[in-house]
């Protein structure tokens, strides 16, 4: 044994998890919502994420920020969850180019939703339709991470992330306002 006190280690692990859960819990819920449309499956995914984050703090060595660590763990769990779901229920995911060329995938009911809810539903649908690597980049960007931090989480270069973000933002902007700024 390496001489570490397991009780002390568990206490540190619990404290780190409690802090991360308080700091990033809402972001983890948004991430689960982006990866899973089914409410029951989304709850399962969120539980899997929280368990994985808690377990991961036993290995956390501080080489990156806790924020980056939590997002990396959460996105890895979400991607694994999506892969398992696709094996059991195949679903057509879109590349960035296919998304740009396709029509609006949402069927909003304008009488039942406000404009903000409609926009959020459209954005969520567009994000869910993306292939997992693009979805991961968008979600991290929406959580306020910079390209360098996103690159750390995704295992890409900051330049590749910046390029992807530029393309993703352009596609999403076009999908929200296809005729330009004068057409709504």
Where do the model's predicted regions map?
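C-terminal edge and immediately downstream basic/flexible tail or linker adjoining helix-turn-helix-like DNA-binding
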Residues: 2-11, 15-17, 97, 153, ...
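A short, charge-rich alpha-helical start-of-domain segment used by transcription regulators
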Residues: 4-30, 40-43, 54
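Amphipathic alpha-helical segment used for protein-protein interaction
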Residues: 19, 23, 106-138, 143-152, ...
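Residue-level preference for hydrophobic side chains embedded in well-ordered alpha helices
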Residues: 20, 24, 28, 32, ...
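C-terminal flanking helix
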Residues: 25, 29, 50, 131, ...
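Structural recognition of an alpha-helix C-terminal capping motif at a helix-to-coil junction
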Residues: 44-51, 55, 64-76
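Arg/Lys-rich amphipathic alpha helix in sigma70-family domain 2
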Residues: 59-61, 72-94, 104, 108, ...
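DNA-recognition helix of helix-turn-helix
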Residues: 75, 79, 147-178
């Amino acid at each position: 044994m390496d001489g570490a006190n397991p009780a002390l280690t568990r206490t540190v692990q619990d404290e780190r998890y409690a802090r991360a859960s308080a700091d990033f819990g809402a972001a983890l819920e948004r991430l689960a919502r982006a990866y899973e449309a089914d409410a029951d499956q989304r709850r399962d995914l969120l539980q899997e994420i929280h368990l994985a984050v808690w377990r991961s703090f036993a290995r956390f060595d501080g080489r990156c920020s806790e924020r980056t660590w939590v997002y990396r763990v959460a996105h890895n769990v979400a991607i694994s969850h999506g892969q398992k779901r696709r094996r059991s229920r195949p679903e057509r995911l879109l590349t960035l180019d296919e998304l740009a060329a396709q029509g609006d995938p949402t069927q909003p009911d304008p009488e039942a939703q406000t404009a903000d809810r409609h926009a959020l539903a459209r954005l969520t649908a567009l994000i869910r339709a993306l292939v997992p690597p693009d979805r991961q980049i968008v979600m991290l960007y929406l959580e306020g991470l910079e390209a360098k931090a996103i690159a750390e989480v995704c295992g890409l270069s900051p330049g590749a992330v910046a390029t992807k973000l530029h393309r993703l933002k352009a596609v999403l902007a076009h999908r929200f306002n296809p005729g330009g700024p004068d057409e709504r």
